[in-house]
Design a protein with these regions (language model features):
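Generic hydrophobic secondary-structure packing signal
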Residues: 53-56, 74
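Short, well-ordered amphipathic alpha-helical segments that serve as non-catalytic structural scaffolds
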Residues: 56-67
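Short glycine-aspartate micro-motif
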Residues: 4-8
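Short beta-strand-loop/turn "lid" adjacent to the catalytic site in phosphate-handling enzymes
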Residues: 66-78
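Short glycine-rich, Thr/Ser-proximal phosphate-binding strand/loop in the N-terminal lobe
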Residues: 14-51
Length: 78
């Protein structure tokens, strides 16, 4: 069995899905977390992310990293 984490960061939210992948190709999702980041609404006049947007994204990624550690993830795909 391999433990896989998939991270998707979109314009409105970030999601972490952790699954167990078995040798026969079957999988079992064991954790799913979604955080509303609203990045599309947090840009400055030059269309760059604000410092607050970057800070909240970093905090979310720290939370995701912690969960990956708890679930002893073998591989992360982002």
């Amino acid at each position: 069995m391999q433990r896989i984490a998939i991270i998707d960061i979109g314009s409105n939210s970030a999601r972490l899905v952790i699954s167990h992948i078995y040798k026969n190709g079957a999988y079992n999702m064991v954790y799913n977390q979604k955080e509303a980041l609203r990045l599309s609404q947090k840009v400055d006049s030059s269309n760059m992310l604000t410092e607050a947007a970057v800070a909240s994204t970093i905090e979310t990624m720290k939370s995701f990293a912690y969960m990956c550690k708890i679930y002893r993830v073998d591989k992360t795909i982002a």
